[in-house]
Amino acid sequence: MNRTVMMALVIIFLDAMGIGIIMPVLPALLREFVGKANVAENYGVLLALYAMMQVIFAPLLGRWSDRIGRRPVLLLSLLGATLDYALMATASVVWVLYLGRLIAGITGATGAVAASTIADVTPEESRTHWFGMMGACFGGGMIAGPVIGGFAGQLSVQAPFMFAAAINGLAFLVSLFILHETHNANQVSDELKNETINETTSSIREMISPLSGLLVVFFIIQLIGQIPATLWVLFGEERFAWDGVMVGVSLAVFGLTHALFQGLAAGFIAKHLGERKAIAVGILADGCGLFLLAVITQSWMVWPVLLLLACGGITLPALQGIISVRVGQVAQGQLQGVLTSLTHLTAVIGPLVFAFLYSATRETWNGWVWIIGCGLYVVALIILRFFHPGRVIHPINKSDVQQRI
């Protein structure tokens, strides 16, 4: 394995571990500042604040990494996360928590820059494999993080945030001393180096246009992923009378199998079937899993369904790979920033929409929300079938655009 790729994957793992450490204990920290009655409201606002900052700033940071290099932006992002966790660990008033989340949201480009780094140093035909490995490392970090956070939380409610700050500080040092710059500065034109904010937003729109169909599919798939993320606990309790232990075990099994499929199967299937067919296989597997969730009535039936849902994990790496090869090397940061922005946009919209739909339909049948997910997959397959984008290159200058589109 290329050392640069390995370091990028380690950074992704550490970043996800930091997130996983703090999320289960954040409500407990909030309770110390706002009281039990206002925890849910403040928790939701903190999550939404971070996500909205990512929606706005991730494409700009990605574009910035195309201009000045991957390492400086990655270091800024890791420093922002470290500062966020340190502020949370030492906060004495609630507004400091909001300040920390604001800083982390504005500077948070770790995933986008790590993906750009991988795209810089891997051949096009193996992108799906490495994007799958990236997803697997993120999933592994999200599995390990809550375990560490749970044990650290036994020390104090602030201890998990100190651990998260230390882990992100470690990732910062790895990036500073070991990770090499992968972006070729010779490919950056003077026009790009001196680009204004208006020109940056214009260039983002120009890049999005030829990829609009694939980006819509990406958005739909990420949006569908918000259904179980939002409703798994409620659905398990109501349909199968699960307690907290069963919910936790099911999430752990799904997380592990999902990571294995992304890391081991995504690249293999894409290599033998091609990215488009790999995407279709993933959509069909996940769609069947959603349909079965809607109709099954026994708790034991969930476990084979989880394998289908895990197989759906090959979809996003294959889609990310097929989008990545349609964008020139000089615009990988911008592209990955746009994908990060779309991902966080679904994290804002999805819970609101699907929680409302579930609440509105649960009295008649609490399986409707999974059927809606299947319907969205049908839309994604139709777009995938009829949308055929050509190869695009980020518009460094107009003559280059005309030659390459």
UniProtKB/Swiss-Prot annotation:
It is found in: Cell inner membrane. InterPro entries: MFS (IPR011701), MFS_dom (IPR020846), MFS_trans_sf (IPR036259), Sugar_transporter_CS (IPR005829), Tet-R_TetA/multi-R_MdtG-like (IPR001958). GO terms for molecular function: antiporter activity. The chain crosses the membrane at residues 6-27, 42-62, 74-94, 102-122, 131-151, 159-179, 215-235, 245-265, 278-298, 299-319, 337-357, 364-385. It is a multi-pass membrane protein. It holds the Pfam family MFS_1. CDD domains: MFS_TetA. Belongs to the major facilitator superfamily. TCR/Tet family. Resistance to tetracycline by an active tetracycline efflux. This is an energy-dependent process that decreases the accumulation of the antibiotic in whole cells. This protein functions as a metal-tetracycline/H(+) antiporter. This is Tetracycline resistance protein, class E.
